């Protein structure tokens, strides 16, 4: 399918993985830019 989570999409259990340029933020459960 190639569907991925965009900026601020819900991520985690049962959700699509975040798009490559984002990571799933455990604090918010949303796709966000990687934090250093």
Swiss-Prot record:
Disulfide bonds join 4-19, 11-24, 18-31. InterPro entries: Huwentoxin-1 (IPR011696). The keyword NADP does not apply. Keywords: Disulfide bond, Ion channel impairing toxin, Knottin, Neurotoxin, Potassium channel impairing toxin, Secreted, Toxin, Voltage-gated potassium channel impairing toxin. The keyword Disulfide bond applies. GO terms for cellular component: extracellular region. It comes from the Eukaryota. GO terms for molecular function: ion channel inhibitor activity; potassium channel regulator activity; toxin activity. Expressed by the venom gland. It is found in: Secreted. Gating modifier of Kv2.1/KCNB1 (IC(50)=5.1 nM), Kv2.2/KCNB2 and Kv4.3/KCND3 channels (IC(50)=39 nM). Acts by shifting the channel activation to more depolarized potentials by stabilizing the resting conformation of the voltage sensor. It completely inhibits opening of the Kv2.1/KCNB1 channel at negative membrane voltages and dramatically shifts channel activation to positive voltages. May act by partitioning into lipid membranes and then by binding the voltage sensor paddle of the channel from a place within the membrane. Belongs to the neurotoxin 10 (Hwtx-1) family. 44 (Jztx-4) subfamily. Negative results: has no significant effects on Kv1.2/KCNA2, Kv1.3/KCNA3, Kv1.5/KCNA5, Kv3.2/KCNC2, Cav1.2/CACNA1C, Cav2.2/CACNA1B, Nav1.5/SCN5A, Nav1.7/SCN9A or Nav1.8/SCN10A channels. The presence of a 'disulfide through disulfide knot' structurally defines this protein as a knottin. This is Kappa-theraphotoxin-Pg1a.
């Amino acid at each position: 399918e190639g569907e991925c989570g965009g900026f601020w999409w819900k991520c985690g259990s049962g959700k699509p993985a975040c798009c490559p340029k984002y990571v799933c933020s455990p604090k918010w459960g949303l796709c966000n830019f990687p934090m250093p």
